[in-house]
Curated annotation (Swiss-Prot):
PANTHER family: SENSITIVE TO HIGH EXPRESSION PROTEIN 9, MITOCHONDRIAL (PTHR31961:SF3). Keywords: Coiled coil, Membrane, Mitochondrion, Mitochondrion inner membrane, Transit peptide, Transmembrane, Transmembrane helix. Residues 54-118, 400-429 are annotated as: Disordered. Residues 49-98, 196-228, 266-301 form a coiled coil. Residues 59-95, 106-118 have a biased composition (Basic and acidic residues). The keyword Cell membrane does not apply. The chain crosses the membrane at residues 319-339, 485-505. One of its GO terms (cellular component) is mitochondrial inner membrane. Homooligomer. It is found in: Mitochondrion inner membrane. This is Sensitive to high expression protein 9 homolog, mitochondrial.
Amino acid sequence: MLLPVLRASSRIVMRHSVVFNCIRLQSNKPERSQQINELKLREIIEGTNFGTEATKKRKLEEERKKLEKEREAERQREEKKEREAKLEEANKQNEADFSSTKTGKLKGEDSEVDHKKDEGLRIENKIIATTDSSVDATDIPNIAEEVNETIQKEIGGLPSEKQKKQSALTKKITQYLDSAHDTILTVTRALNDVTGYSAIERLKKSIEEQEEDLKNAKKYVKECKLTYGDAIQKRSHSQREVNELLTRKHNWSPEDLERFTELYRNDHENDVWEKECEKKLEEAELKVDAVQLKLTQLILTRYHEEQIWSDKIRRSSTWGTWVLMGLNVLLFVFATFLVEPWKRKKLVLGFEDKVKTVLVGIAQENDAVLNPIIEKLDQEQKDGSTGHNLEKSGYLTLEDEGGQTTSLPASLDSTSSQPPSAPVLSKEQQGSRILRAKASIKFFILQAQYAIVSSWHRVRVTCVKSYTALTTPSIEFLKLDKVEFGLYTFIISILSCGLGSLATIYCR
């Protein structure tokens, strides 16, 4: 009977000491429930059937994580030291003493680097890497030229080689084309500035940029929608899992407690993340709407500005057409009423001068031929043997209706080798012939002037007759020939085009 009592008392003492030791060991760190600030979560955890096992497991997990963090930090420090050592070694390898040779190339030795590695180093890299004052600055251009020649020989067909091979004429033509191209661009730009099309070009570029912004904004909206959907799905999944854990609250395992604590803590983060995603989505949608509105406004502005520009160009072209028509009319009037009469007058005067010159020449020839004959006849008349001498000379005297005599050849012998002589004319006959020629010339001039005056009179009479025929009520039918019909059609077409253009300009 005493033995069981002693055993029971010893068990009570042992249990009391174990509990006291546990309390003393756990008093150094706060309980898990003290680390949690949320009252609701603390109440849920305190209502479970967990003891000190979960707390110990949590402590072991935290210690393990701390050890892993320390190892990771140590490993990073070692990697950093290795990288620094490699950098120092590379810097030592790059430090070398270079000197120039007769050809201008560089060579150098490094006490810590193998000669084979130094030979593989390119000349241009040596020029950049060296800091030794032994390299002369005057050698660097020669080295650069040699390097450039080496590159051109290795590659070949470079534009610089082709440019060197061009002739002087080709270079001049190229320069002229470049200058002409620049001039054309300058003129085009100036014309666009004058007409206001440069601003429309800038507006078109802004529309293209706005379209690109709209595309990017829509893409960002899609990404925000996907992110927002993922956030909603993640939170709903977390809440579903929390609800499942709460249904079996009194049968939790240590893993369930850790999972519930993690889910409960992440729920607030998920909520914040979901709200942020929703806010970003709303902002992205508002931005899309703003960009879309701005793009629509830019397109409308461009359409309106292009309409104004096209109206301005159309108006300018209309006025240009009218100016050209006016110039053509002025040229037609000038040519018809000034140039053509002057040309006719000049032609008539020239023809008259030519006729006078010809007649004077003929008269001089006749005088040269007839003067010896007249002198001979006068001498024979004085001697009283005019008829006998005329018969001997082969001439006959004829008397016309006016009582004037004319000497003509009596006979023409076809076998005679002598040409027939010209008829003998008196001075009065020669003067009468000259007067007749002048009268014929004056008649021709008067006839030409009459033709001009009569043509203008005929046109005027035709216009008056046409107006009278159109205004007379008794006349019901008109008969036109082809010339009159073509003339009337031309006049009506010009009048209709002019009136239509004036109505179009002043009725806008």
